[in-house]
């Protein structure tokens, strides 16, 4: 995310700031290759880059997930305060539909997008019926990798295996949204991500 702020460098912090900026640049260079990868399954950074390149500065983005929201925070630039909404690092999953409906009511006519993990979608997906019934246009994009990513990968790193961190792969969440009165589309290739962006109501 980008924020506007002013800072007056101090002599004792210059070396530290130079080091931090150098490391940040190296990280951005590493990320660039991943953001442009055509690999299948789609890497979350490529997924988020496609979203970033489409959005305008008046789009409210609601993050609801683990890994996918972490990647989104690195890749998607938000230039206005209050246009990135999530419950924070100690918040809970499942808040996005309420946030998104409130954003659409507060800013009628502006784009509202939910960036979902598949686990988070399982906590509030039925609320698409509420958005359809109240005619609140919200676009939702689900990173569907079939795992609780922020549970599985730390468990494997710490204890060597994962417990209760799997979801059923390949669930057709797009069909669920259609059953609730919305529009759904499945996208499996990076080059089709833009084609899978109809900007229709949920």
For each feature predicted by the language model, list its residue ranges.
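Terminal amphipathic helices with adjacent charged low-complexity linkers/tails
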Residues: 1-18
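A general, composition-driven signal for non-globular sequence regions
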Residues: 10, 24, 28-32, 128, ...
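Alpha-helix initiation/capping motif
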Residues: 9, 37-40, 166
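Thiamine diphosphate
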Residues: 1-5, 70-72, 76-202
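Active-site diphosphate/adenylate-binding microenvironment
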Residues: 22-103
């Amino acid at each position: 995310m980008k924020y506007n702020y002013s800072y007056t460098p101090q002599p004792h912090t210059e070396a530290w700031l130079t080091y931090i900026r150098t490391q940040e640049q190296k990280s951005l260079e590493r990320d660039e290759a991943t953001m442009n990868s055509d690999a299948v399954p789609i890497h979350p950074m490529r997924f988020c880059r496609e979203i970033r390149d489409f959005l305008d500065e008046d789009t409210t983005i609601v993050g609801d997930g683990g890994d996918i929201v972490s990647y989104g925070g690195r890749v998607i630039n938000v230039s206005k305060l209050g246009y990135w909404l999530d419950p924070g690092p100690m918040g809970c999953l499942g808040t996005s539909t309420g946030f998104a409906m409130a954003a659409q009511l507060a800013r009628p006519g502006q784009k509202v997008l939910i960036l979902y993990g598949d686990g988070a979608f399982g906590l509030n997906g039925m609320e698409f019926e509420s958005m359809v019934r109240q005619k609140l246009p919200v676009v939702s994009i689900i990173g569907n990798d079939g795992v609780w990513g922020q549970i599985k990968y730390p468990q494997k790193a710490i204890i060597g295996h994962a417990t209760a961190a799997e979801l059923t792969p390949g669930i057709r969440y797009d069909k669920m949204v259609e059953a609730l009165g919305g529009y759904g589309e499945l996208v499996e290739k990076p080059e089709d991500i833009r084609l899978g962006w109809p900007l229709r109501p949920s």
